[in-house]
Amino acid sequence: YPTRTERKILKDNKTEIANEIGKSAVLIEPGAGDIKKIAIFLSSLDKPKKYIPLDISEDYITKLSQGFKKKFPKLAITPKGYDFSKNNKLPFKIKSSENIIIFFPGSTLGNFEKKDAVKFLKMLKSKFKAKKIIIGVDLVKDIPTLISAYDDKKGITAKFNKNILQRINTELGGDINLNSYKHLAIYNKPKKRIEMRLKSKKNNNIKINGSKYLVKKNEEIHTENSHK
């Protein structure tokens, strides 16, 4: 539901969003991904000046932006490779006098611990000299709905969660059998967050970077949080 619901919110409120953003905006989207969400309200804006989508993969975001430029030919689009989580120097110049708007949808903020989320938001405001920030966050709701979103019947989230094991195999010389682990999505009520874990189905002897480890049967690897 998160992506579907967020798209609907943006569509239903695009006029109000445009009014809040104002005229001649410079839109910056950290972790832009497929850049589809900003397209929902972009045509409603009053003469936007520039759109800067940022992604950790510059090749990916550059290729994706080519089609975006055809859809919005009058808009200056400058894709850049940038890992916003590392707080590195920006790969472009910005002016504090400009109407800079940060667009950060997708409830990615929920992946941070609370103190880190506050720190991250302060960084966005200061580093990007943002006038306003549009953030997507997921709300607390009934537990079955939350669980089903992170343990979907199609197994999309499970595949995403297990991808970290595949990356260990590819990048760190691992020999992990992905089928030996079960994807879990658990709601931690006191901390108001979904916890994604990988549960070992049996005793697994694994190798990472030449070192050997034992992951015991039913032992859980805590991979990610999504705070609500």
Model-derived segments and spans:
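Conserved SAM/SAH-binding beta-strand->alpha-helix loop
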Residues: 57-58
